[in-house]
UniProtKB/Swiss-Prot annotation:
Span list, region Required for binding CDKs: 53-58
Pfam families the UniProt entry points to: CDI
Protein name according to UniProt: Cyclin-dependent kinase inhibitor 1
Post-translational modification: Phosphorylation of Thr-145 by Akt or of Ser-146 by PKC impairs binding to PCNA. Phosphorylation at Ser-114 by GSK3-beta enhances ubiquitination by the DCX(DTL) complex. Phosphorylation of Thr-145 by PIM2 enhances CDKN1A stability and inhibits cell proliferation. Phosphorylation of Thr-145 by PIM1 results in the relocation of CDKN1A to the cytoplasm and enhanced CDKN1A protein stability. UV radiation-induced phosphorylation at Thr-80 by LKB1 and at Ser-146 by NUAK1 leads to its degradation.
Effect of S114E: Phosphomimetic mutant, increases ubiquitination by the DCX(DTL) complex
Stretches with biased composition (Basic residues): 153-164
Gene3D superfamilies membership: p27
Gene: CDKN1A
Length: 164
């Protein structure tokens, strides 16, 4: 079942498997479709939440938006450095934090999200398994669960008419 030497196809993507099932991709049409879909989603969210997510301003409507004090953004989310506000992909502008939202935040409002981890060696007494300790169940193997562990098995009763 080998193909003849003249019918060998060249893989256009090199060694990777690559198929175009529906023809070439029109990138301009794709970007227009994505932009239209995004605009529709933004408009739907704007009408639902009475908030303009593009300019980050509240709108008149069912909801009354107010600033929550003391919940400032962590430093992780604030833009820093010479590439401030630049997208890593393509160099376009990415949405930054609005000055209206950051107004009134101070250094003490930021939450410190740093964590530290230290390894603690086990002592010989705990490794042997003290009663009630975490090493108590290490020696036993767990059996594999089956369907009957979750559902009780029942016998099906079949009533048939007896012949006279």
């Amino acid at each position: 079942m080998s193909e003849p030497a003249g019918d060998v196809r060249q893989n256009p993507c090199g060694s990777k498997a690559c198929r175009r099932l529906f023809g070439p991709v029109d990138s301009e049409q794709l970007s227009r479709d994505c932009d239209a879909l995004m605009a529709g989603c933004i408009q739907e969210a704007r009408e639902r939440w009475n908030f303009d997510f593009v300019t980050e301003t509240p709108l008149e409507g069912d909801f009354a938006w107010e600033r929550v004090r003391g919940l400032g953004l962590p430093k992780l989310y604030l833009p820093t450095g010479p590439r401030r506000g630049r997208d890593e992909l393509g160099g376009g502008r990415r949405p930054g934090t609005s000055p209206a939202l950051l107004q009134g935040t101070a250094e003490e409002d930021h939450v410190d999200l740093s964590l530290s981890c230290t390894l603690v060696p086990r002592s010989g007494e705990q490794a042997e398994g003290s009663p009630g300790g975490p090493g108590d169940s290490q020696g036993r193997k767990r059996r594999q669960t089956s369907m009957t562990d979750f559902y009780h098995s029942k016998r099906r009763l079949i009533f048939s008419k007896r012949k006279p």
